[in-house]
Amino acid sequence: MGVIRILLSLVSLVFKALDSVGILWDARLRLSEFIYGKHGVLTVRGPTKRILKLPACVIAEYIKKRKLTCVEVIEAFRDRILEVNPILNAVVGDRFDDASEEAQHIDQVLDSSDINLNQEKSDLLSKPLLGVPITVKESIACEGFTNSAGLVDRKDKIASEDAAVVKNLRDAGAIPIAVTNCSELCMWWETTNNVYGRTNNPYETSKIAGGSSGGEGAIISAAGSVCGIGSDVGK
């Protein structure tokens, strides 16, 4: 049994090493190609920036300890979304400029030696998700974004305030950077509608991303978001 445990530990270390350089991502794509054929296979390679592979709690901790700047984090996920979204059609609205401004303010306060900012700095350091970029399902109100739920009659509807879940995450320090596609009125198993079109599966683009939170699932799976807000109407 001791030998088996050692072998399993070695295998685990090998897989972690391969995953850290994106090799497992490519392997999954090659397996998909073998099973389904070359048509529709995702052409975007796995993420190469280390930031994109970090969990939310680690990102927040690194920002607080100044191992990462908040601007670096926001820019990394912005660039990843711009890279993969033309293939996935997962993100249907963004606030990259506003998010960058919020990130710059966080960095300025944390790096400042001004004693007048000590209270604000203390408040920021108490936030568990400080600087973590998040995405939000478009059917969930996020101030300034469309809130159509994929319905043509609501395509010009703009959220005037955040839903409670979005507000709570903002209060915890998270920074919304984009909203994502959903099925029409969140009632279908495929993320497609007549406002934004269909969202594709990151691992096999000829397949669906599921629903109704397929936009969230797709962009998070493609390392374009640390975490996000989805929903399920249940059975």
Tell where the protein language model's regions lie, with residue ranges.
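Conserved hydrophobic/aromatic pocket- or pore-lining residues that grip, position, or stack substrates
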Residues: F77, A99, G131, K137, ...
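A structural signal for the main folded, soluble domain(s) of proteins
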Residues: L13, A17, G22, R28-S32, ...
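Hydrophobic face of alpha-helices
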Residues: V71-E75, P133, V166
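An N-terminal boundary/leader segment
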Residues: M1-Q104, Q108
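Enzymes and membrane/adaptor proteins characterized by extended Gly/Ser/Thr/Asp/Glu-rich
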Residues: V84, S122, K127-V165
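Short glycine/serine-rich loop segments
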Residues: E161-K235
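Immediate post-signal peptide segment of exported/extracytoplasmic ligand-binding proteins
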Residues: I106-V132
